[in-house]
Amino acid sequence: MAVRIEVLKEDNRTRARLGKLHTPHGVIETPVFMPVGTQATVKTMTPEELKDLGAGIILSNTYHLFLRPGHELIREAGGLHAFMHWDGAILTDSGGFQVFSLGDLRKITEEGVEFRSHLDGSKKFLSPEIATQVQMALGSDIVMAFDECTPYPATRDYAKASLERTTRWLKRCQETLTTTDRQALFGIVQGSMYEDLRKQSAAEITELDLPGYAVGGLSVGEPKELMYEVLDYTVPLLPKDKPRYLMGVGSPDALIEGVMRGIDMFDCVLPTRIARNGTALTRYGKLVVRNAESAHDFSPIDPTCDCYTCKNYSRAYLRHLIKADEILGLRLMTIHNLRFLTNLMSEIRAAIKENRLPEYREKFFYEYGYLK
Ligand SMILES: CNc1nc2cc3nc[nH]c(=O)c3cc2[nH]1
C-alpha cells in the first residue's frame, strides 16, 4: 500500500497544513514528530509505552542496523516490526548522513561510500542499491533515498556536484525497488544554502513523482535563521499533495517554525538524548533537573504536563536518580520529553484547525522564553 498524505486543511495565514499520513502500519496525524529509535529501540522505552505516549511512527537507522545486528538477521526475524515488537509505522534513514557523521569516512565515489565502521573499524561499503536493499530487508514503511547530506558550509561548486550525485543516486534507489515498493521511497532535496541549487535539486527530485519528499542538508550546524530562510524558498517547490519531511529537526521552537513553513514530518534525537542526561523540555523552556536548584524541589517537572513522570515523581527524585546513574531516571525523563513533544504537536494541530497558529506561536515563544 502506498504511503500518502491526505491534506485536511491548509492554514489561511501560514503554509502550515493539517493532514493524515497513510502508511502500511497505520494512519498518523500530521504535523508529526517521530521519535528516533536508531538501533531498533527508542532508547529505554517499550513499544507499549511509546503507543501510550501517542507515538504512531518512529525512525530507525539503516547505517546502525546494517553494522549491527545486520539486515539479514532482521530479515530472518521477519523484519524490523517483528524484531522490535513495534506495530506502528517505521521510517528508516538511508545511512548517508550517519556515514558522514559517524563512520571514519574513507571515500565517496560515484559508486557509493567506503567507510570504516565506528564499531570495530572494519571496512564497509554503502551504495544506493545496498542502502535500498537493506531498508527493504528491514521492511520499513518509508524508505529514504541514499543521498549525500552536503556538509555545511559548502562551496557552490561542491554543493552543485553533490546534489547532482544525490539525484543520480536517487534514480538508482528507485531502480532497485519493485514498482510496488517504489511507493515507499522518499527523495531528499539538497543544494545546501544556495537558492538556485535548491531549485535545481527540487526540480530534479520531484520530476520522479515520489510518494514523499524530505528537505535534507539542514540542521547541520547552520544558524536557525538560515535554516528557516532555506525552508522559505524550498518548501514551496515541493508538491502540496505529498508529505514534506524536515530531517533532524528538532527543538520545540524549530518544530513550530517548520510547521509554519509547510513541513509535515520531523525527527530528532535531541529530546531523548537530553532526557538521558537530565534535561527536561517544558513549556517554560528547558529544565536541567540535575542542577542543584531541583535538589529540594518536590514539585513535578511541569505541573501542566499529563505524563506518567509528572503525575508521580518530583524534580528532587529525578535529580537523585540522574545523579545516581539510576536507569529509572533515564526512563522517566524520556517519558516526559516524548510526551511533551507529542502534546506540543497535538496543540499545533489544534491551532491549525482553529486558525490560530500564529497566536499559538506567539504565546508559546513568550512562555518558553524566546520572546523577551
Ligand atoms: C540532526 N540533523 C540532521 N539529521 C539529518 C539526517 C539526514 N539524512 C539524510 N539526508 C540529510 O540531508 C540529512 C540531514 C540531517 N540533518
Swiss-Prot record:
The active site is at D93, D267. One of its GO terms (molecular function) is metal ion binding. It catalyses: 7-aminomethyl-7-carbaguanine + guanosine(34) in tRNA = 7-aminomethyl-7-carbaguanosine(34) in tRNA + guanine. Pathway: tRNA modification; tRNA-queuosine biosynthesis. Its cofactor is Zn(2+). GO terms for cellular component: cytosol. It comes from the Bacteria. Binds 1 zinc ion per subunit. Substrate binds at D93, S94, G95, G96, F97, D147, Q190, G217. It is an enzyme of class 2 (transferase). GO terms for biological process: queuosine biosynthetic process; tRNA wobble guanine modification; tRNA-guanine transglycosylation. Its EC number is 2.4.2.29. Keywords: Glycosyltransferase, Metal-binding, Queuosine biosynthesis, Transferase, tRNA processing, Zinc. Residues 248-254, 272-276 are annotated as: RNA binding. Zn(2+) binds at C305, C307, C310, H336. It holds the Pfam family TGT. Homodimer. Within each dimer, one monomer is responsible for RNA recognition and catalysis, while the other monomer binds to the replacement base PreQ1. Catalyzes the base-exchange of a guanine (G) residue with the queuine precursor 7-aminomethyl-7-deazaguanine (PreQ1) at position 34 (anticodon wobble position) in tRNAs with GU(N) anticodons (tRNA-Asp, -Asn, -His and -Tyr). Catalysis occurs through a double-displacement mechanism. The nucleophile active site attacks the C1' of nucleotide 34 to detach the guanine base from the RNA, forming a covalent enzyme-RNA intermediate. The proton acceptor active site deprotonates the incoming PreQ1, allowing a nucleophilic attack on the C1' of the ribose to form the product. NCBIfam families: Q_tRNA_tgt, tgt_general. Belongs to the queuine tRNA-ribosyltransferase family. This is Queuine tRNA-ribosyltransferase.
